[in-house]
Regions:
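C-terminal amphipathic alpha-helical "assembly" element
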Residues: 9-83
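Glycine-rich beta-alpha junction loops
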Residues: 1-7
Length: 83
């Protein structure tokens, strides 16, 4: 899943509309449902739903600042996921 953690809604919309929507060839509304872009709590909600549906592995592709994004994911998202 594409990953970009940010609390800046404008930046999240920019990543969705200017980067991911064209790459995926899908409308922003559809892309928004299928990627982890935005605040950590929203990403936790999406991943918890996948986990509840039986998904056990998710591959992450940070769209920028790989090391920073993966560190944020480790610090802000993973601890909140159901075990």
């Amino acid at each position: 899943m594409f990953l970009y953690l940010t609390d800046d809604q404008r930046k999240a919309e920019e990543v969705l509309g200017e980067l991911l929507s064209p790459i995926m060839g899908r409308p922003v509304e559809l892309v928004r449902e299928r990627v982890l872009v935005g605040p950590a709590n929203e990403c936790v909600e999406k991943l918890a739903k996948l986990q509840a549906a039986g998904v056990r592995k998710v591959f992450l592709w940070p769209v920028a600042d790989d090391a920073v994004q993966l560190a944020k994911f480790h610090e802000e998202v993973l601890p909140q996921l159901p075990q």
